[in-house]
């Protein structure tokens, strides 16, 4: 009787293990197929370029003023030299503050534009995985190897759920 119970438990365990379903998809590829994602990344890139141009302009001004001060240092009064050095310090602080604030605003804009898309994608993945009975789904963009014979690519199913091609 004891052997029969052990055999039964072993059979149930093996049956349960063989019935498990695994899914995978490339999340980056999925994002790129969503038109709103492209639009959001274009907006973020445009803002990033604006900030980079402004920062480059400020750094150019700093470099120009530094060169000018170095060239005139021997011919100007101590008071004027000190005044220009103070201006350079203030400009340096402004550059640093601008850089920090620009990065924070860029991150906020990125989150504002992309978070709804990320949430929508995550919800679609969960819906498809639950509907199809997958026990877990792997992002194949993060994996070194995926045995495609033992798991299912759910990218087409998730795209259909999202209504994208």
Task: Provide a role label for each language-model segment.
Residues 1-22:
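Bacterial Sec-dependent N-terminal signal peptides
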Residues 20-165:
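Amphipathic, charged alpha-helical segments and their helix-to-coil junctions
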